[in-house]
Amino acid sequence: MITGATGFLGRNLCEYLSSHGYQLRALVRATSNTAMLEDYEVELVQGDVLDPASVRAAVKGCDYVVHAAAYFRLWGPPEPFQNTNVEGTRNVLTAARAEGVQRFIHISTIIVVGPQKAGVVITEQTPRQPYPSDNYAKSKSEGECLVGSFNDQGLPTIILRLGALYGPYGHYAFNRLFFEEFLHNWRVEVHHGRHIIFPCYVVDAAKAIEAALKRGHVGEIYNISDQSISHRTANSIISRLAGRSNWRINVPRWLMLQFVKILELIAYFSKHEPFYPRNLEPYVFHDWIVDCSKAQKELLFTPSNFHEGARRTLDWYRSIGYNV
């Protein structure tokens, strides 16, 4: 059973697992667009992670649960993050324990550790210290604590901490910043693109989930990411693959932060997420150097290089009408 099946990761996961012979069931909200799942023979159970009865019905009879549902924004009050990412997770864990599932894969994020000092390599042992204003990271950290507690009580759980997802069907965060802004000729680069980002091609994430189902060690956490690269390197690869020049307007940190403050002020009155939310700051102005050797050794996880993932992502943008 998969939660979050109509989301960015979930859609790619259903496509991948269906092509590898898995029988899939998904918990979907009444308002979700499920047309994208029709090709993957997914059994749909209508409900919500906030409704324990519907979660129990979705889990019943399933061997595995992949909990990929999450409320992910870079802006907004804490309540929706807490509701979905903490209480929703509690409901799915409770149902999985009650139904005796064989394995529970919890999808988390590397950002639960918070930004690190320059040169620090992030491993699974890096303490959780989410950025104070990042309600998403804080709620995902709490969700991990819940998973650990249920594991201690006998539910076989594995936590996968994903890097910055990009790839087909994505339009937010990494996809927007590195692909869509560029394809719309918005050529901004902060700090000469020197900081390090931790991309994760979404199909690699799907492969890692299957590997965790087969080979993951119960009770463990695994970092799942491609090789960490600089913003400048990512921009250069995307530009070259798209056949466009790699020029960028360099924006100093102080100017970008002032611009972000203005956008936040406008958002306060408009009630709409700003184009550059404040919580992008830890991603853009810090280095995220991630060690995935544990997943490579225990899950046999082999990430794509960014060149290949970016090429496939640009192919997808071309298929939906972008001028690439």
Name every feature range the model reports, one short phrase each.
Residues M1-H20:
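N-terminal Rossmann NAD(P)H-binding glycine-rich loop of SDR-like oxidoreductase domains
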Residues T31-E38, V42-E87, A95, P115:
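NAD(P)H-binding glycine-rich loop region in Rossmannoid oxidoreductase-like domains
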Residues E87-N135, I158:
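Conserved Rossmann-fold NAD(P)-dependent oxidoreductase catalytic core, especially the SDR/UDP-sugar
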Residues P132-I158:
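Active-site Tyr-X1-5-Lys
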Residues S141, L155, Y166-L177, A211-Y222, ...:
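Glycine/proline-rich active-site loop of Rossmann-fold NAD(P)-dependent oxidoreductases
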Residues F150-I197, V202, I238:
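NAD(P)-dependent short-chain dehydrogenase/reductase
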Residues G167, V190-H195, Y222-I229, S239-A242, ...:
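Glycine-rich Rossmann NAD(P)(H)-binding loop
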Residues A211-F275, C292, R311-L314, G321-V324:
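Mid/C-terminal beta-alpha module of Rossmann-like enzyme folds, strongest
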